[in-house]
């Protein structure tokens, strides 16, 4: 193993923010070796990226700059809705958006993404089959494997998958039993009114609400990840009514915010990232991660190249990194 590989692995192992994307002790990045796309003029380029604070980190950008030779790097932490607003408003401040897959249509349909050739990614050969082999349960376009490609020939990518995980429910075992917590409906249970939490991103919240509504007998949506317009309208009514009734202590959007709200006891049940639950437990506070009867919510995040960037090679190198 090379020194570069050791440094990369050490960086990921000890980065608390990046660990917010890991399952247990596994590394969240899909590639386990250090192979970076190099370009002769990379030193003349810069990388300006935007995304969640758990992927956009100075120590990661610093390491990328050192190993790639790119001239400059800068990162802006923002929620997905805020980042989308900036990019669709025509901002020229970014070369790359570390986007979550469900928001890909927003930049594809508005021509704000420039596809990345798969052949330019040395690490593509190591990608997990999660992103290359479709499941027979749904049509390919309803799965991540059918959404990341810009062409039917599968030669260019609208998003290069970098991290992925499955989210569940974080809860205080001193307040809820495992049986109570092991359903998405727990977040909306009046018993925990004023002490539950929900992610502020509507594309996340809606899917979780629909799973809860199915369990509560309020809907019968076959694929909560791809609801119809009518099903979305019903979920919106449900969420608005719950918010007006004071169900939620907070609509959280950041890792640190989530940890603080759970550790303080202000939120006793919420949708949560597993490492946030681990961070609460590390403080000596009671916190567990549920196994929802409806299943977990899967997601994938990765770099997308913003159309019109003059730093294309830097974005490709970062995606490969």
Predicted segments with their positions:
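Hydrophobic residues within well-ordered alpha-helices
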Residues: 87, 261-263, 305
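Alpha-to-beta junction loops
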Residues: 90-98, 112-113, 192-194, 264-270
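Early extracytoplasmic/lumenal segment of secretory-pathway proteins
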Residues: 38-110, 259
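Oxyanion-binding "anion nests"
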Residues: 254-275
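N-terminal secretory signal peptides and thylakoid transit peptides that target proteins
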Residues: 2-23
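Extracytoplasmic/periplasmic substrate-recognition and gating elements
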Residues: 272, 276, 281-321
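Extracytoplasmic ligand-binding site segments that recognize negatively charged/polar headgroups
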Residues: 55-57, 108-257
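Short beta-strand-to-loop elements that line the ligand-binding cleft
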Residues: 72-79, 98, 246-254, 290-291
């Amino acid at each position: 193993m090379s020194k570069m590989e050791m440094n990369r692995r050490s960086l990921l192992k000890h980065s608390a923010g990046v660990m917010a994307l890991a399952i247990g002790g596994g590394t969240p990045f899909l590639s386990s070796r250090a192979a970076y796309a190099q370009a002769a003029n990379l030193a003349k380029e810069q990388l300006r990226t935007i995304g969640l604070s758990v992927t956009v980190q100075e120590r990661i950008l610093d390491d990328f700059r050192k190993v790639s030779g790119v001239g400059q790097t800068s990162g802006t932490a923002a929620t997905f809705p805020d980042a989308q607003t900036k990019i669709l408003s025509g901002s020229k401040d970014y070369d790359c958006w570390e986007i979550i897959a469900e928001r890909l249509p927003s930049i594809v349909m508005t021509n704000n993404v420039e596809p990345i050739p798969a052949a330019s990614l040395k690490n593509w050969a190591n990608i997990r089959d999660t992103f290359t082999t479709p499941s027979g349960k749904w049509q390919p376009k309803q799965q991540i494997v059918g959404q990341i490609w810009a062409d039917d020939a599968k030669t260019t990518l609208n998003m290069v998958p970098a991290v992925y995980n499955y989210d569940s429910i974080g809860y205080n075992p001193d307040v809820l039993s495992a049986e109570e917590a092991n359903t998405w409906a727990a977040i909306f249970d009046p018993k925990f009114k004023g002490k539950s939490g929900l992610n502020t991103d509507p594309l996340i919240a809606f899917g979780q609400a629909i799973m809860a509504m199915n369990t509560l007998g309020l809907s019968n949506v076959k694929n909560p990840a791809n609801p119809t317009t009518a099903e979305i309208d019903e979920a919106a009514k449900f969420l608005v009514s719950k918010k007006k009734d004071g169900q939620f202590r907070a609509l959280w959007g950041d890792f640190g915010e989530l940890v603080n709200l759970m550790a303080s006891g202000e939120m006793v049940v919420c949708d949560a990232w597993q490492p946030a639950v681990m961070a609460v437990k590390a403080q000596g506070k009671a916190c567990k991660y549920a196994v929802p009867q409806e299943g977990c919510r899967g997601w994938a995040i990765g770099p997308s190249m913003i159309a019109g960037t003059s730093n294309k090679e830097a974005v490709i190198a970062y995606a490969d990194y």
